[in-house]
């Protein structure tokens, strides 16, 4: 495929929606090129390997039977799912001066699931369906210009690519970094900065262990807390149940602490609940997602949950050549992996 071919479709953003869209269009024999500003694919899906090889999720993790498009895609790609472990006693902390409460979570008829091997298996498998030369990492789009019968896409490295259609598969708040010529209509350009970006305010942590001592002691690993740095935590053992750990979220105030202070506060809170065995961890990592969403050199503004799936995000622009896709644009399950896939399918259906 010639990169200057005006029949080429350019997808801006190599997250789940962009990769799913490229995969769906490849089945229609449509030429696509993915431009990703980051040095990695996946967007808000990021699985790392711990020191013992444990797949640890710093981004999107869970889904359910209510997400049929994701389930169908996993089946189509030959990927396995498994239920989130929840057997045993769980902790609930109300106030710091009150003892924690223990409770049991009943086995759910519709449990949360995870992807065997880590959520990035989905990203990696989709990427393998696309020729490597048509995935450009560390390529930030700076401008999109409409010319006769095509769009010209300029990148930060000075490259200019031509396309018959361009799909913006990135959070709407980040679209304002792109210069459009002619400018987008005022109604859509005023909406874009107000759309909430999912996970932009999240801080996620993972801990890796040699053995699941909490399970051996009758605990699920689940924690809900109104005190301490960790408001929410879950068992994070792998599909084969031979690698073990925890994953959870840190409260918003943790963003002002150093990594070492965050780790110390996490371990202090958890040791009060699980005992000294919590200190025998193999690795600790956390991810401040606000660091991923940089707009004009600053972190994006945290928005309330608003304007996801807005009607103006469903329309096309620049003479039916420019489209929006992504989980924020989905009219269903916005913020979930399911929403990203639904949005991609809706765009693919227009080709």
Whereabouts are the PLM-identified features?
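Core beta-strand elements of the Rossmann-like FAD/NAD(P) dinucleotide-binding domain
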Residues: 5-7, 156-165
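A conserved short coil-to-beta-strand element within the FAD-binding core of flavoproteins
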Residues: 137-151
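Flavin (primarily FAD) binding-site architecture
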Residues: 168-187
């Amino acid at each position: 495929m010639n990169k200057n071919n005006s029949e080429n479709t350019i997808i801006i953003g190599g997250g789940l929606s962009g990769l799913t869209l490229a995969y769906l269009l490849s089945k229609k024999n449509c030429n696509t090129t993915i431009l990703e500003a980051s040095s990695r694919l996946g967007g808000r899906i990021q699985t790392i390997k711990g020191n013992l090889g444990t797949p640890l999720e710093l981004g999107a993790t869970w889904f359910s039977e209510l997400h049929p498009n994701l389930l169908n895609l996993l089946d189509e790609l030959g990927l396995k799912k498994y239920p989130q472990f929840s057997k045993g006693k769980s902790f609930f902390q109300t106030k710091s001066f009150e003892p924690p409460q223990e409770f049991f979570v009943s086995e759910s008829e519709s449990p949360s699931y995870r992807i065997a091997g880590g959520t990035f298996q989905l990203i990696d498998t989709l990427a393998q369906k696309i020729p490597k030369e048509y995935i450009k990492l560390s390529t930030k789009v700076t401008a999109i210009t409409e010319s006769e019968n095509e769009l010209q896409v300029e990148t930060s490295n000075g490259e200019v690519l031509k396309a018959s259609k361009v799909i913006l598969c990135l959070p709407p708040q980040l679209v304002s970094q792109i210069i459009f010529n002619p400018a987008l209509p005022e109604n859509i350009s005023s909406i874009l900065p107000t759309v909430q970006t999912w996970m932009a305010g999240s801080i996620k942590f993972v801990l890796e262990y040699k053995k699941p001592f909490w399970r051996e002691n009758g605990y699920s690993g689940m924690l809900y807390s109104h005190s301490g740095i960790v408001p929410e935590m879950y068992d994070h053992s792998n599909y084969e149940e031979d690698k073990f750990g925890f994953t959870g979220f840190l409260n918003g105030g943790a963003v002002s602490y150093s990594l070492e202070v965050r780790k110390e506060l996490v371990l202090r809170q958890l040791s009060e609940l699980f005992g000294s065995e919590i200190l025998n961890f193999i690795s600790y990592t956390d991810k401040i997602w606000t660091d991923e969403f940089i707009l004009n050199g600053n972190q994006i503004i945290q928005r309330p949950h608003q304007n996801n799936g807005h009607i103006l995000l469903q329309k096309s622009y620049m003479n039916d050549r420019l489209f929006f896709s992504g989980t924020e644009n989905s009219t269903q399950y916005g913020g979930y992996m399911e929403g990203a896939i639904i949005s991609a399918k809706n765009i693919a259906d227009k080709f």
